[in-house]
Amino acid sequence: MRTKILHIKGKVTAGLGEGRIFLSIPYYIESFKKYLGFEPYAGTLNIVIYDRISLENRLILDLAKGIIIPEHKEPNRVLGSVKAFPSSINSISPAAIVIPARTTHPKSVIEIISPYYLREKLSLKDGDEVEIEVYL
């Protein structure tokens, strides 16, 4: 089976810190280890897409199968499902684009997880351009 690769370019942007909260929840930590093969750093790297081709590729992800982290019910809350796509960012892997079922981000903003603190590993600051390869 051949892997299809989508390319998405964008610029690093600051988030609200919500990724850190969700990636500290044991259910998500264990699920990402199980389904993606790595324990994610407790935070996401947010990327804003600014070109047409990258945005079209991002929209393809809405229709693509991806890896589904199922919804999880706890006594006081429901943890929403997440669709994930194995990826690399500036040739660093493992990484994954994560698309939560419930998000406040527009389609032009994507979230990346990795076992690494990507801002440090790639020496990134807000406004820096990155290239993501998404493996379908």
Swiss-Prot record:
Coiled coil: none annotated. This is Riboflavin kinase. One of its GO terms (biological process) is riboflavin biosynthetic process. FMN binds at residues 103, 111. The gene is ribK. Pathway: Cofactor biosynthesis; FMN biosynthesis; FMN from riboflavin (CTP route): step 1/1. It comes from Sulfurisphaera tokodaii (strain DSM 16993 / JCM 10545 / NBRC 100140 / 7) (Sulfolobus tokodaii). Binds 1 Mg(2+) ion per subunit. The keyword Magnesium applies. It comes from the Archaea.
